[in-house]
Amino acid sequence: MTNIRKSHPLMKIINNTFIDLPTPSNISSWWNFGSLLGICLILQILTGLFLAMHYTPDTMTAFSSVTHICRDVNYGWIIRYLHANGASMFFICLFIHVGRGLYYGSYMFLETWNIGVILLFTVMATAFMGYVLPWGQMSFWGATVITNLLSAIPYIGTDLVEWIWGGFSVDKATLTRFFAFHFILPFIITALATVHLLFLHETGSNNPTGISSDMDKIPFHPYYTIKDILGALLMIMALLILVLFSPDLLGDPDNYTPANPLNTPPHIKPEWYFLFAYAILRSIPNKLGGVLALVASILILILMPMLHTSKQRSMMFRPLSQCLFWVLVADLVTLTWIGGQPVEHPFIIIGQLASILYFSIILVLMPITSIIENSLLKL
């Protein structure tokens, strides 16, 4: 008799995805972050659902409804902080996941990579809209500043911004629609993640060497299920330490002041995970140029397969490219720091240099370095 796990239409899908999946025997802990992202997504949907039961998307009551969740709802405070800091965990895992893809050449799986870039954009949009919902000062002014960037689009810009706002400023209509989108987008992300996984399983996983591992595969269960559970426990532990000991560490104190359109905070800045892109935006004095650079800083990922000039897929055996990769990581950390600083000397020039370096490494230095490494192979 055939095992039900392999014959039942639903069980068969689960079996081929999480149990009998042939997996390279040498994938390292850097491959754990896909499953961690899945766990983050489930956590965000569940905590978000319970928050939505008590939240009111109205300018008059939004701020007090969040306060009510923290003060009066049973364990509301932990649900709220798990959701807020869960977003930070989500982005930490996302950045590592993308970085792993860049380092080991996973972008050569075109469909998987492109859907991943779409997922990144969608998650960023969802997080931005979620930040607006508590209706604190930084929520309101962040929404005003970021949506206003669309006014840089020639001819249709102003109309587009007012259409998104649902009026002549960020107001009740904006908050209501942001709540609606923030609620629906995680389910779209889940669907996209399923397609992401579907395309990945068409080709099989990459591995640290970047060489085909068809002759050396092991079943996903029990080896990688155990490994993923360990990764999940470590991540949940880190998240709980953050939530229970310093829940406001990554937030902005300004967001504990109710939104006031008549009073602008001294430094308007988004959440920490957008600061690198915000720094690139601010480093260009022209509004349209800044917006284009902001979009390009993420969209550049789509070009990675075309910029790959090396004969080797992975950076594992390419020390020069490795150095450049870690310079890129340091550059992104620098941009994140600059994004949170006021617009004054010396931060302006540091931000401009870091932005130039970011695009130079990806578009110029990495392809040239790969060509040099190719020639070194012949020696």
Curated annotation (Swiss-Prot):
Keywords: Electron transport, Heme, Iron, Membrane, Metal-binding, Mitochondrion, Mitochondrion inner membrane, Respiratory chain, Transmembrane, Transmembrane helix, Transport, Ubiquinone
Gene3D superfamilies hit by this protein: Cytochrome Bc1 Complex, Chain C
Coiled coil ranges: none
Intracellular or extracellular location(s): Mitochondrion inner membrane
Pfam families: Cytochrom_B_C, Cytochrome_B
PROSITE patterns, per database record: CYTB_CTER (PS51003), CYTB_NTER (PS51002)
Residues given in the record as heme b b562 binding sites: 83, 182
InterPro entries given in the database record: Cyt_b/b6_C (IPR005798), Cyt_b/b6_C_sf (IPR036150), Cyt_b/b6_N (IPR005797), Cytb/b6-like_sf (IPR027387), Cytochrome_b (IPR030689), Cytochrome_b_C_euk/bac (IPR048260), Cytochrome_b_N_euk/bac (IPR048259), Di-haem_cyt_TM (IPR016174)
Any Gene Ontology biological process: mitochondrial electron transport, ubiquinol to cytochrome c
Keyword tRNA processing: no
Cofactor annotation: heme b
Domain of life: Eukaryota
Topology with respect to the bilayer: Multi-pass membrane protein
Binding-site residues, heme b b566: 97, 196
Transmembrane stretches, start-end: 33-53, 77-98, 113-133, 178-198, 226-246, 288-308, 320-340, 347-367
One GO term describing the cellular component: respiratory chain complex III
Other known facts: Heme 1 (or BL or b562) is low-potential and absorbs at about 562 nm, and heme 2 (or BH or b566) is high-potential and absorbs at about 566 nm.
Similarity section: Belongs to the cytochrome b family.
Physiological role: Component of the ubiquinol-cytochrome c reductase complex (complex III or cytochrome b-c1 complex) that is part of the mitochondrial respiratory chain. The b-c1 complex mediates electron transfer from ubiquinol to cytochrome c. Contributes to the generation of a proton gradient across the mitochondrial membrane that is then used for ATP synthesis.
Subunit structure: The cytochrome bc1 complex contains 11 subunits: 3 respiratory subunits (MT-CYB, CYC1 and UQCRFS1), 2 core proteins (UQCRC1 and UQCRC2) and 6 low-molecular weight proteins (UQCRH/QCR6, UQCRB/QCR7, UQCRQ/QCR8, UQCR10/QCR9, UQCR11/QCR10 and a cleavage product of UQCRFS1). This cytochrome bc1 complex then forms a dimer.
Stated name of the protein: Cytochrome b
Gene from which the chain derives: MT-CYB
